[in-house]
Regions:
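Short alpha-helical segments and helix-capping/turn motifs at coil-helix boundaries
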Residues: 106-114, 147-150, 159-160, 214-218, ...
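Active-site substrate-binding loop specific to GH73 endo-beta-N-acetylglucosaminidase modules
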Residues: 83-92, 105-109, 141-385, 495-496
Length: 496
């Protein structure tokens, strides 16, 4: 594989079939960190479609998403109560179509990765979206896509400490790990609950994952006391999407809900929602760091954890394993660690170090199923996803984005564990997972109508002789396409 495509395969999503190739691929790769990132996609399916920017009307902001999901939940309550106009199948579908964002956001994510001109930024976005996993528990489906776009992609050129804070406080994370209900054992909310004979207390899910997965990792040898104290720092953060009380017949208008939110947290902004009545009073100690009481304590905690030695070492290894090699060397990891320390966590400098190390490394890098899928579609010029204007239209042979990701076996909108998807190829090399790639390569050829032939693709990428021999052992163009896209070279199993 030529140098341009070797780097685009390892660090990006492959050049689109009609994109000129850069002469200085290293300079191009580093410049990609500051590429513009509009959400590009297609309105309707057509052969050799060209990406255009998604309209604002299908990209609601966070408050609009909150209001939509709240309305969805209240309409579901009206349905349960048997109210006229809410119980028919048409009404149920209309409620989902108008107020749920999960399926549309998955299509937008697919479009970005297929038509985007910021391929390296999108790969780093996927890495961090996986690092800060927020699996779909239904009630956060309106927020997962927003977190990816606004907490991660929008902050790729900033500092890791800022991204950590923005993801920790995002509705998607606070909902996913049940922090919205958490309250300190000595909080006013807990006292009131005990007086009423009810239960209210601390949930340590997010406190635990903040230490174990998002920052220092178990190598820091934190204790259960550290986890509990981190959870106490987090107590009070977040508001559950949708209906906001357990009252059986609560049916609030948007205005009434906002009034209630302001009373509870002083704001209607779910990304800055802190309930003082749920907060644990007093200072807390986490890994020796004393954290003050109140809303500002969380920023002090995340800043401390972001610059911790164990955080730097742990995430540098993850970056190296994801982009450089399945088995990164100590020098690979240290190169990223040194860039992190010298820049005090500046993501531009960290990502530049990753790029430099990936380019200098001759090791192959196996690609995730979703990364491979996007690369195949981009390389071939196929049109494999519906347009944003076709969400409710049946297109024979073209699955919805949600169905594609489910069948592929990887999606940021799946129900999944907080540790996310592994970057280790051993987790993806089963016969079943390989058979899925064969099926998708077949479907992309048969239903996506690739613009380029297998021979044209091999010439453009500079495929090696082993790959060419494999492809040429078949006579049918479809079989050649499948063999090429599922070859060890294109999957990242052998040196390109």
């Amino acid at each position: 594989m030529n140098e341009q495509f070797r780097i685009a395969h390892k660090l990006g999503l492959m050049f689109l079939h009609d994109t000129p190739l850069p002469e200085d691929v290293k300079a191009w790769a580093i410049s990609q960190l500051h590429a513009k990132s509009p959400a590009l996609g297609i309105k309707r399916w057509k052969f050799n479609a060209i990406g255009k920017e998604w309209p604002k009307s299908v990209q609601p902001n966070l408050l609009e998403r909150d209001n939509m999901f709240s309305l969805y939940k209240y309409n579901r309550k009206r349905e349960e109560m048997g109210l006229d106009g809410y119980t028919s199948e048409a009404a149920k579908r209309d409620n989902e179509r108008k107020n749920l964002m999960g399926e549309l956001d998955q299509l937008k994510f697919a479009h970005r990765n297929v038509y985007g001109e910021d391929q390296l930024k999108l790969r780093f976005t996927a890495f961090w979206a996986n690092h800060f996993t927020t699996g779909n528990i239904w009630d956060n489906q309106n927020h997962i896509g927003h977190a990816i776009d606004e907490a991660i992609l929008a902050n790729l050129n900033g500092n890791f400490s800022h991204m950590l804070y923005k993801m920790t406080t995002h509705s998607s994370m606070l909902t996913y790990l049940d922090n919205c209900w958490s309250c300190g054992e000595n909080s006013q909310e807990a006292i009131w609950a005990r007086e009423d004979g009810q239960q209210a207390g601390l949930n340590d899910n997010l406190g635990r994952e903040l230490l174990e997965l998002h920052t220092v990792s178990p190598t820091a040898k934190y204790t259960e006391s550290d986890i509990k104290n981190a959870a106490n720092v987090l107590a009070g953060w977040g508001i559950w999407p949708g209906r906001i009380s357990g009252e059986e017949h609560e049916l609030l208008s948007t205005e009434q809900r906002h009034t209630k939110l302001r009373k509870m947290g002083g704001t209607i902004n779910s990304w800055d929602f802190f309930k003082k009545d749920h907060a644990e009073p007093g200072t807390k100690r986490v890994l020796g760091k004393v954290i003050p009481a109140g809303k500002g304590g969380l920023k002090q905690l995340t800043d401390f954890l972001a610059s911790h030695e164990h955080t730097i070492n742990y995430i540098s290894f993850k970056l190296a394993q994801h982009f450089v090699s399945d088995n990164p060397s100590k020098s690979d990891i240290n190169y990223i660690v040194n860039a992190w320390k010298k820049s005090n966590g500046n993501l531009d400098q960290i990502h530049t170090a990753v790029i430099e190390r990936a380019i200098s490394s001759t090791e192959p890098k196996f690609q995730w199923p979703m990364t491979w899928l996007f690369q195949v579609v981009r390389l071939s010029g196929a049109t494999y996803f519906k347009g944003w204007d076709e969400m409710d239209k049946y297109n024979q042979g073209i699955m919805d984005a949600r169905e594609i990701f489910e069948e592929l076996g990887q999606s940021f909108w799946h129900e999944r564990q907080p540790n996310g998807y592994s970057s280790d190829k051993k987790e993806w090399l089963s016969g079943e997972m390989f058979e899925r790639r064969i099926r998708f390569a077949d479907a992309i050829y048969s239903k996506g109508y690739p613009y380029s032939t297998p021979d044209e693709i091999m010439d453009r990428i500079g495929a090696n002789e082993t790959t060419r021999s494999l492809v040429n052992s078949f006579t049918r163009k479809k079989d050649q396409f499948i063999a090429l896209m599922c070859s060890p070279e294109l999957m990242g199993l052998k040196n390109a």
